[in-house]
Amino acid sequence: MTDDVPDVRRFWESLGLPGLVDVHTHFLPPSIQRAVYAVFDAAGPKIGREWPIRYRQSVDERVELLRAMGVRRFPTLPYAHKPGVATYLNDWAAGFKRDVPESLWSATFYPEPEAASYIEGLVADGVEVFKVHVQVGEFHLDDPLLDPVWGLLEDAGTPIVIHAGGAPVGNDFTGPAPMARVLARFPRLAAVIAHMGAPDLVEFLELAETHERVCLDTTMVFTDFWPQPYPVELLPRLVDLQHKVLLGTDFPTIPYPYAHQLESLARLDLGDDWLRAVCWHNGVRVFGLPGA
């Protein structure tokens, strides 16, 4: 996959940037990574379509590929799919951070009685980003067990990448309403809405417009693979939200070259300043530079 490198570097070099900040990448323990690949390979009910994953190299090879492409900061974004696994995932992610210092120290949680305790410790230790995935984990964002967690994260200002939308296949736990209820109680939560909230693009856009710390990530939206064209009438609002849109890709679990996500953003024709903000400046503002 080293042939992907020139196209990616050409993109950010043409914008005069020093690289990219990608806020939505995944690195998981090998056994769980294999299980995730198997779910996508089976194109089961939570995937809903063929999804040929392009990047299946080892952890070390994928890290080196991101580095070669010029991705300066990237997370692991583990996500707990059931009670009792968050601590295992978080311990593995902490080890990854030690081995890959430019990565964003990531962690996850699940609605369980001990969640507030381990989140409090992780925040104190300096975790840089959390991830939850309600479509996979099948839980409600406004579960009372998460109330103390949201309070801790709102006070800390730590970003949380939240897969709250119904893409690729919705269920009883997805959609904008639970996120809106959480934000009504914790309005300064630093939520990064994965996939721009697709398919509920308008509703999640409105949450970003009306809440100071809510941002959107671009993951897979705008690409040719994505089944839902982004409404043209919403593009001016994305320009207004230039400071709140963050580059995300879902690497390695994508069925096209990494550069295609970047090309899909460029062809929106929202201007080079918008691209610079999305692909670098916003991520640096939220997460800082490596070693800073």
What are these regions (language model features)?
Residues 63-66, 70-85, 92-110, 131:
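Short, well-structured secondary-structure segments
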Residues 24, 66, 93, 122, ...:
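Conserved, mostly hydrophobic/aromatic
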Residues 56-66, 88, 111-122, 145:
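Short, acidic/polar
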Residues 3-4, 128-129, 139-246:
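Catalytic pocket-lining loop regions of alpha/beta-barrel enzymes
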Residues 26-31, 81-84, 112-115, 137, ...:
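Active-site environment of divalent metal-dependent phosphoester hydrolases
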Residues 45-56, 78, 104-113, 138-141:
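Active-site mouth loops of central-metabolism enzymes
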Residues 25, 78, 107-111, 132-134, ...:
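A cross-domain feature marking catalytic cores of carbohydrate-active enzymes
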Residues 1-23, 30-73, 241-244, 255-292:
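Mid-to-C-terminal alpha-helical segments outside catalytic/metal-binding sites
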